[in-house]
């Protein structure tokens, strides 16, 4: 008789005999020991700390809120102002330095190095904009570059925290924390209205101080060592699932609160306090789950009784277990990197192989003509609002909030996979559709406040989805182990697009500024009227159509790849069940 192969996942499976003993007896479930509860709670404080860091460090999104004031103080043209926005985006080109630093220094050192760079980068700009000191344009450019680099270092610290402490749920942890980066501008706008809504230089002071303060607040969770138990039991997995659900609900509530608060100025301080409470409240989420399990035992027991008895396993963990078992039983490891001598999509790609792929360039163009245009639009919101006589703070908040919604929606392929058989690249193509619609709406009726706000919301929604979904698509198509390098190659389109699109927009802006009707403040030209950005909106709209076409081509070419990956997962799961029958 062939012996049963046992592995660490046995403890994840409920005993089927417990469902066949006749009438189920429901009883109040005992709370776990305080030491266990505290250990689990500490793990969630790490995720909450990452959320705080992300929510406070998306400082590049509020550039448009103070850019007009900075332009006036420096006495520069619109083109040179655009170069400052490019400098902030150019920091992404040096983001690899944070990975090297992690090889030599603890994570806490990397975190505070990022805080120090942001403190200096934004702090010096605040000293310049308040006329405390005077600096040449080149040094201000370097400060913008340093501030942009600090954001990359903060992001790296958050990614490492999620990967170390949530190895079985890292995709959920990463998507949740990255989403909060999208609400930074709305959060800073609310703080701006609560403190002093008449001084736009306050944004730079907040950008300098808040991430530093948050880094000190997050120090204790950052120093927490990850759990050694990489295969938690059934109760732990169910507990984690419920906590993630609560955190996602709180994320949506927080975003709605920030969005609705942007239109209210009379109770700005109360709204800001409410936002802070919503950011702190996730610390209570694990305790709510414990209370639910304790006070609603009958409901929980019935749900467990009526369930199928199967437990969802992490696919990466499943692959590792399958590999170890296969080495003992003669089963071949599935999902090999090569088929003959040809590397397929979905396998690991080197740099040379990556840039030789047509699919990569379709992906690059789709991102370049989609998400990057949305980012450049957000950088120009200050001048767009000024030229149309609108409030830039409101537009920044709308863009930030809907960018956050887009980032949350990027998880749709995982939750709706069984209902809608659409690949990630298909969702990516759909997410690009609102962008050309929004720009042509702006070209036709940008002078109307409703049209301007609607278009801004559509662009924020589209670009937010693209920013968050791109990491998963890169991993799917070009290999998960190479995603760090390959994704950094992909996002080189951001500084290129920021420079190109921003320069074109600035040139059109200055060409339509008539000295006879346009005031000149500190040698900087200010354009007023619909014509300032009309041609820019048309140009961006046409380019975004190219992005949609490119994304559709990518979707068509990658459908077989996702079908093969899905079959591999099904085969892997079936093989695992054959090796370990119940």
UniProtKB/Swiss-Prot annotation:
InterPro entries xref list: MFS_trans_sf (IPR036259), NFD4_C (IPR056555), Nodulin-like (IPR010658)
Intracellular or extracellular location(s): Membrane
Membrane topology: Multi-pass membrane protein
Coiled coil: none
Signal peptide: none
Transmembrane segments: 46-66, 100-120, 132-152, 172-192, 202-222, 243-263, 270-290, 358-378, 395-412, 425-445, 458-478, 489-509, 536-556
Annotated stretches, region: Disordered: 1-20
Effect of loss of the gene: Failure of fusion of the polar nuclei during megagametogenesis.
Key word Zinc present: no
GO biological process: karyogamy; polar nucleus fusion; response to salt stress
Pfam family, any one: Nodulin-like
Any one of the GO CC terms: membrane
Keywords: Developmental protein, Glycoprotein, Karyogamy, Membrane, Transmembrane, Transmembrane helix, Transport
Function: Required for karyogamy during female gametophyte development, when the two polar nuclei fuse to form the diploid central cell nucleus.
Protein name stated in the entry: Protein NUCLEAR FUSION DEFECTIVE 4
Lineage, opening ranks: Eukaryota, Viridiplantae, Streptophyta, Embryophyta, Tracheophyta
């Amino acid at each position: 008789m062939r012996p049963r192969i046992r592995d660490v996942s046995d403890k994840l499976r409920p005993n089927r005999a417990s469902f066949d003993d006749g009438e189920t007896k429901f009883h109040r479930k005992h709370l776990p020991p305080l030491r266990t509860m505290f250990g689990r709670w500490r793990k969630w404080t790490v995720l909450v700390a990452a959320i705080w860091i992300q929510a406070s460090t998306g400082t590049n999104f509020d550039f448009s809120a103070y850019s007009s004031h900075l332009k006036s103080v420096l006495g520069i043209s619109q083109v040179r102002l655009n170069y400052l926005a490019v400098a902030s985006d150019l920091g992404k080109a040096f983001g690899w330095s944070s990975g090297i630093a992690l090889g030599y220094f603890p994570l806490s050192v990397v975190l505070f190095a990022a805080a120090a760079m942001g403190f200096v980068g934004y702090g010096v700009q605040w000293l310049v904009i308040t006329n405390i000191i005077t600096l040449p344009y080149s040094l201000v450019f370097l400060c913008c570059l340093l501030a942009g680099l600090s954001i990359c270092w903060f992001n790296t610290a958050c990614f490492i925290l999620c990967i170390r402490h949530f190895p079985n749920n890292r995709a959920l942890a990463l998507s949740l924390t990255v989403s909060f980066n999208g609400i930074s501008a709305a959060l800073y706008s609310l703080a701006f209205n609560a403190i002093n809504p008449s001084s736009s230089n306050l944004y730079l002071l907040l950008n300098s101080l808040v991430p530093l303060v948050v880094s000190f607040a997050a120090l204790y969770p950052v120093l927490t060592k990850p759990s050694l138990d990489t295969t938690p039991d059934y109760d732990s997995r169910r507990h984690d699932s419920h906590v993630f659900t609560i955190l996602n609900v709180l994320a949506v509530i927080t975003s709605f609160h920030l969005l609705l608060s942007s239109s209210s100025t009379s109770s700005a301080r109360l709204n800001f306090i409410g936002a802070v409470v919503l950011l702190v409240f996730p610390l209570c989420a694990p305790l709510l789950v414990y209370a639910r399990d304790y006070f609603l035992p009958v409901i929980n027991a019935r749900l467990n009784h009526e369930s199928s008895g199967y437990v969802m396993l992490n696919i990466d963990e499943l692959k590792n277990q399958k590999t170890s078992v296969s080495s003992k039983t003669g089963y071949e490891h599935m999902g090999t990197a090569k088929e003959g001598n040809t590397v397929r999509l979905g396998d690991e790609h080197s740099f040379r192989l990556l840039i030789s792929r047509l699919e990569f360039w379709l992906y690059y163009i789709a991102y370049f003509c989609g998400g990057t245009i949305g980012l450049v639009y957000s950088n120009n919101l200050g001048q767009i609002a000024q030229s149309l006589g609108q409030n830039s703070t409101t537009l920044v908040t709308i863009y930030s909030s809907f960018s956050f919604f887009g980032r949350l929606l990027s998880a749709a392929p995982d939750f709706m996979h069984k209902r809608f058989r659409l690949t990630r690249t298909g969702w990516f193509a759909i997410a690009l559709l609102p962008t050309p619609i929004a720009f042509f709406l702006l070209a036709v009726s940008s002078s109307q406040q409703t049209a301007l706000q609607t278009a801004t919301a559509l662009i924020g929604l589209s670009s937010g989805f693209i920013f968050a979904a791109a990491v998963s698509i890169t991993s799917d198509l070009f290999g998960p182990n190479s995603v760090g390098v390959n994704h950094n190659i992909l996002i080189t389109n951001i500084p290129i697009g920021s420079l190109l699109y921003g320069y074109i927009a600035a040139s059109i802006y200055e060409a339509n500024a008539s000295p006879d009707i346009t005031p000149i403040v500190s040698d900087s030209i200010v354009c007023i009227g619909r014509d300032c950005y009309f041609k820019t909106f048309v140009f961006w709209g046409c380019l975004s159509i190219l992005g949609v076409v490119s994304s559709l081509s990518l979707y068509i070419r990658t459908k077989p790849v996702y079908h093969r990956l899905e079959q591999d997962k099904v085969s892997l799961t079936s093989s695992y069940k054959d090796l370990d029958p119940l």
